Design a protein with these regions (language model features):
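A short helix/loop element that forms part of the nucleotide-sugar donor recognition site in Leloir-type
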Residues: 55-59, 206-221
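Helix-loop-beta element that forms the nucleotide-linked donor phosphate-binding surface
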Residues: 175-176, 181-202
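Nucleotide-activated donor-binding/catalytic signature segment of Leloir-type glycosyltransferases, i.e.
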Residues: 268-294
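A short, well-ordered alpha-helix in the C-terminal region of glycosyltransferases
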Residues: 360, 367, 374-388
Length: 431
């Protein structure tokens, strides 16, 4: 009988946390288990968004997946020094755990905590010939350089780049989220295997979902001719100003075109403060439970996605994939040369909004509000683009193939032909 291959996932947050990246790592564990892998997880006992909450169960075997949660102090993640201390605390705990544990064939390290690349030289010493893989969701120190609010931090980020360059030398495979991110990482001249494997949507309906009329009215009001929704995190990397500008132009041209913002993040309060009593075509809503998430995403006709240009290749907004998964094209406020900008143009799954084409976008939205056949055609294309290029099955099949290929020099690991069913998703995950 062929011995099952083994893999360890290392990431700051994991099930039952509801933050999107934790859900992706939880999904990955589940999907690799289905494909015949023995999966171990090293994570923390903390939640991303709920600073004072802890996960009590430190060791857990859930549906065959071995989860080990290292204790982490409740130091404030929103402050720079405590956040770095949290990272170092976890790095030391994880390395000690790996030192004591049986080694696995592969180790997949995510990019949270920040500067997790520092783990790789030590992992190489501890794990020998195991395959070391870096899955980059947020690129550091580039994220600090993109923020640029603190000159001292910016200087520190520049000084640490040579250390990160050295750490990449110990990685075998680097997984990025898009071509621009791959280009940024390639600037380190790492000469390692590079591959783009995007995150998938948390909800993947098999057909384009129908709109719930009651929920649509709750979100956009009555007599809506076109609904545009921003759903998810509104953080430092995102912008909303151009969305407000076109909404205010449309308020007079076509009152039936409505905008809704439903989310959280560093800039969400700024958005709410920017609204006036005259912005009656702009609504603000809270998060939806996972049971309501698919309905929430489907009630919009078009989804809003944004990324500031200095963040191109540093992060890739996951809401892009969630939008396509429910058959909704995107209005993307960002650079046409960014990862999402390139996909929007290549797959014709949305529009790009910038300061030079505001009036053009406004006119297109007015036209779409009246031409439902064109809108439906656009939505069907968005749904098919997701199925063909970004679905969880497609991405995880690529992950499985990649991981098994790394073992060919030691003997081929056959693929699992009869995957078992395993699902430990939490019913309270967020958008």
């Amino acid at each position: 009988m062929t011995q099952k291959p083994t893999v360890t996932l290392i990431y700051h947050f994991f099930y039952p946390d509801d933050v999107v990246s934790a859900r992706h790592f939880s999904d990955m564990a589940e999907e690799l288990d289905k494909r015949g892998w023995n999966v171990n997880v090293l994570t923390s006992n903390r939640y991303c968004r709920y600073q004072h909450s802890k996960i009590d169960q430190r060791k857990e075997i859930l549906h065959g997946i071995d989860i080990r949660r290292s204790y982490r102090p409740g130091w404030n993640q929103s402050k720079n020094i405590p956040r770095l201390c949290n990272a170092l605390w976890l790095f030391l705990n994880w390395l000690f755990t790996i030192f004591r544990a049986k080694k696995t064939d592969c180790y997949i390290v995510g990019s949270d905590p920040q500067f997790s690349q520092i783990l790789f030289p030590f992992l190489r010493i501890l794990t020998g010939n195991s395959t070391l893989i870096y899955w980059c969701f947020d690129l550091y120190p580039e994220a600090i350089l993109a923020d640029a609010r603190n000159s001292l931090l910016t200087l520190g980020a520049r000084l640490v780049k040579p250390l990160i360059w050295a750490c990449y030398r110990y990685v075998d495979v680097i997984i990025d989220l898009g071509p621009i991110m791959q280009k940024r990482i390639a600037a380190y001249n790492h000469n390692k295997i590079s591959k783009t494997l995007t995150p998938w949507a948390l909800k993947e309906p098999s057909v384009i979902p129908l709109q719930d009329i009651n929920m649509r009215e709750q979100l956009f009001g009555t007599d809506v001719t076109l609904g545009l929704l921003y759903s998810g995190n509104l953080g430092l990397a995102h912008e909303y100003e151009l969305f407000l500008e076109i909404a205010r132009k449309l308020r007079q041209l076509e009152p039936g075109i409505r905008f809704a913002f439903a989310g959280r993040g560093n800039r969400f309060e700024s958005l709410k403060n920017a609204l006036s009593n005259e912005d009656h075509n702009i609504k603000v809503a809270g998060f939806a439970s996972e049971s309501e998430l698919e309905k929430r995403l489907a009630v919009a006709d078009i989804h809003l996605v944004s990324l500031r240009e200095q963040w191109d290749g540093v992060v890739v907004p996951s809401k892009f994939f969630g939008s396509l998964a429910v058959g909704r094209p995107v209005l993307y406020s960002g650079s046409k040369d960014s990862d999402i900008g390139q996909w929007v143009q290549e797959y014709e799954c949305g529009m790009i909004l910038d300061r030079n084409n505001v009036d053009e976008v406004v006119n297109t939205l007015v036209h779409l509000s009246k031409d439902k056949q064109l809108l439906e055609k656009w939505q069907k294309n968005a749904f098919q683009v997701y199925q063909d290029h970004f679905s969880k099955k497609k991405i995880m099949d690529s992950w499985d193939e990649l991981l098994r290929a790394q073992k060919r020099s030691e003997g081929w690991i056959p693929a699992c032909r009869t995957p078992k069913v395993c699902d430990f998703r939490e019913p309270h995950a967020r958008e």
